Amino acid sequence: TVRYRVYEEWITHPQLGRYCCYGIMCESYLPKHGWQLQQAVSDITDDRYAAEALAALMQQEDLEPCHLLDVVEDYLNGM
């Protein structure tokens, strides 16, 4: 079982200052170990609803974790 979740983070950038943004993490469920982080992509968007919609689409389409970076890249290129 794989799940995709949005997480909030605060980043400080030398030119932009401090800002809130959202990333997406991919976790796999392992019996006896629970949910284990597979990978995460940071600073995808500053729009929580957009991040949640993208994570929901990944979940709905049962995206394999190895495709997470490609999907995020496609999303960012389509903005």
Tell me the role of every PLM-derived stretch.
Residues R3, Q38-V41, L69:
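Low-complexity, intrinsically disordered short peptide segments enriched in small/polar/basic residues
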Residues S28-P31:
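Short loop/turn segments immediately following beta-strands, especially the blade-tip
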Residues Y49-M79:
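Compositionally biased, intrinsically disordered linkers/stalks adjacent to structured regions
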